[in-house]
Regions:
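Ser/Thr/Gly-rich low-complexity blocks that favor extended beta-strand/coil architectures
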Residues: 2-3
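Fold-core signature of tandem repeat domains
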Residues: 7-10, 14, 18-23, 30, ...
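Compositionally biased, intrinsically disordered low-complexity regions
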Residues: 18, 44-47, 75, 127, ...
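Single, functionally critical "micro-switch" positions that shape active/binding sites
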Residues: 25, 82, 174
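Short, flexible domain-boundary/linker segments around small modular repeats
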Residues: 27-56, 84-108, 136-166
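Conserved small/polar residues in nucleotide/adenosyl-binding loops
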Residues: 170-176
């Protein structure tokens, strides 16, 4: 497994091409390794075009699309952060090219129970919600989610902006 620091060291040993099978590092470092790709076969540089790549820091849809061009090997994302629609778009990238199946997810725009369920179907990692808006029953359902090992992660609401819809005067009077 190679990191950017390892790759720079390996590349300094030769004027030929270094071929990588596995790379695990932050997005910016993997991108920097990709920039070392030689312009012709066998030339000085680093070839990761067939490498299995794991990106360790949170990435957006734009970064996921960029990373998908780094290699014909599988790109594994450990963490993703973006709007709901963009997270769904990341998951729509064919899973033999790029996967977020076990990624920690942070959704940055407003979601509800239905959207949280969609995200839980896309990853076994924990999901952090920045904003949620739904009725009391659905919010309670989201709050009740727990880790189901190998199936779904927890849904984290501790830092969320929460909006409760469909609150009636009767509900408010009942709690006085």
């Amino acid at each position: 497994i190679s990191t950017f620091a390892d790759v720079i060291k390996l590349n300094s040993y030769t004027n030929g091409e270094v071929t990588l099978d596995k790379v695990t590092d932050k997005f910016a470092n993997v991108q920097a390794i990709h920039r070392l790709t030689p312009t012709e076969d066998g030339a000085d540089g680093v070839d990761l075009t067939a490498a299995l790549i794991t990106i360790t820091d949170p990435v957006s849809l734009d970064q996921a699309n960029t990373a998908n061009d780094f290699s014909d090997g599988l790109i594994t994302l450990n963490s993703v952060i973006d709007s709901f629609d963009n997270l769904i778009a990341i998951d729509a990238i064919p899973s033999d090219q790029l996967t977020m199946a076990n990624a920690a997810v942070q959704v940055t725009d407003e979601v509800n129970l239905s959207k949280v369920n969609d995200l839980r179907a896309d990853t076994t990692g924990n999901i952090t919600v920045d904003e949620i808006k739904d009725n009391k029953v659905n919010l309670a359902a989201v709050n009740a989610f727990v880790v189901e090992e190998g199936v779904a992660g927890d849904v984290i609401l501790s830092e969320s902006d929460i909006t409760v819809t469909a609150v009636s005067y009767t509900h408010l009077r009942a709690h006085e």
